């Protein structure tokens, strides 16, 4: 089956014969009904449960591991729920088979005309191995085989779902707080989804952040590392902040970067971009990039947007 940008809207429901009055029990849903359904699936350990909880917190009705036999019940009767529905399905679901899941979704769309979307949560294999190793949880398909083999088997089983997904979300570089923010921004029910903005400091010696949309190199600023009394501090400490801010190149840098963001951010919002990651890099990701990221995030928040800060190479909780 080919890839579909808008999942499985194969055909409209067949019209009722004109000479037969519709059964009241099969009447169309009330205008207040919400006909959206999101089916969340993907790799075990990738964050599917976090996504379900985030959707539930913003107003979706969430059902996890619904047996596929009960999934079929959604095609029956009248739909008058005021909240959209999110269904969690994975390889532990009773009767799971990718072809069965896709067929059930097709029948649901054909019988009801619901706006059904498949959200696939993915993650790199090496990250999954690390997550399972660190938490000491057992992978559902690695009960009698090595962890890596269980992950490989699951990836093969869910491959058809990933191919047909409306949206694939890779969580390899998304900590839980950032994943929740992405979901809240993209699937908000209260208003047009807002642009979720993340400002991340990093050290070039540890590599570029894979998730970065915009990268700014601040290694030209004076380096606090060479000041013995500042070396063990970070850009979160007032003394380091004052040192970086005193560099005569710092103010022009902030002026030009904020001017660029003032141009770009509204245009990203207009085109419907879901999230934007701005990465600020210095040599070690400890001093200059940290303070610069804090300043840019503060400016973004002052403009009325919500910017989340993460210091990749500091042992710091994202916020």
Curated annotation (Swiss-Prot):
Ligand binding (GTP): 90-93
Disulfide pairings: none
Region feature (Disordered): 1-34
Keywords: ATP-binding, GTP-binding, Nucleotide-binding
Binding of ATP, residues: 42-49
Keyword Transport: no
Pfam families named among the record's database cross-references: PapZ_C, RapZ-like_N
Gene Ontology terms, MF aspect: ATP binding; GTP binding
Keyword Nucleotide-binding among UniProt keywords: yes
Alphabetized SUPFAM superfamilies for the sequence: P-loop containing nucleoside triphosphate hydrolases
Function of the molecule: Displays ATPase and GTPase activities.
Record-stated family: Belongs to the RapZ-like family.
Name of the protein in its database record: Nucleotide-binding protein Rru_A3448
Native source organism of the sequence: Rhodospirillum rubrum (strain ATCC 11170 / ATH 1.1.1 / DSM 467 / LMG 4362 / NCIMB 8255 / S1)
């Amino acid at each position: 089956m080919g890839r579909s940008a808008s999942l499985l809207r194969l055909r409209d429901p067949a019209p009722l014969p004109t000479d037969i009055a519709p059964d009241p029990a099969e009447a169309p849903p009330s205008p207040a009904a919400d006909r959206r359904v999101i089916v969340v699936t993907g790799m075990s350990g990738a964050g599917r449960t976090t996504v379900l909880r985030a959707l539930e917190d913003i107003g979706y009705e969430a059902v996890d591991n619904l047996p596929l036999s009960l999934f079929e019940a959604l095609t029956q009767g009248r739909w008058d729920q005021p909240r959209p529905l999110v269904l969690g399905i994975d390889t532990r679901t009773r009767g799971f088979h990718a072809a069965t899941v896709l067929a059930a979704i097709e029948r649901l769309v054909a019988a009801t005309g619901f706006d059904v979307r498949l959200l696939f949560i993915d993650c790199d294999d090496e990250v999954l191995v690390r997550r399972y190793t660190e938490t000491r949880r057992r992978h559902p398909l690695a009960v009698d085989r090595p962890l890596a083999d269980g992950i490989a088997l699951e990836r093969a089983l869910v491959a058809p779902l990933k191919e047909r997904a409306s949206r694939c979300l890779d969580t390899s570089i998304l900590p839980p707080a950032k994943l929740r923010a992405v979901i809240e921004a993209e699937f908000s029910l209260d208003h047009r989804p807002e642009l979720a903005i993340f400002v991340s400091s990093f050290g070039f010696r540890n590599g570029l952040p894979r998730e970065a949309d915009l990268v700014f190199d601040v290694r030209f600023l004076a380096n606090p590392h060479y000041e013995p009394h500042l070396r063990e501090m970070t850009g979160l400490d007032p003394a380091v902040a004052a040192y970086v801010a005193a560099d005569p190149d710092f103010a022009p840098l902030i002026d030009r970067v904020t001017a660029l963001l003032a141009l770009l951010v509204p245009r990203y919002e207009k085109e419907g971009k879901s999230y934007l990651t701005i990465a600020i890099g210095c040599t070690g990701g400890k001093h200059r990039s940290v303070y610069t990221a804090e300043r840019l995030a503060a400016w973004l928040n002052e403009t009325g947007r919500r910017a989340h800060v993460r210091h990749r190479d500091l042992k710091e909780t994202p916020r």
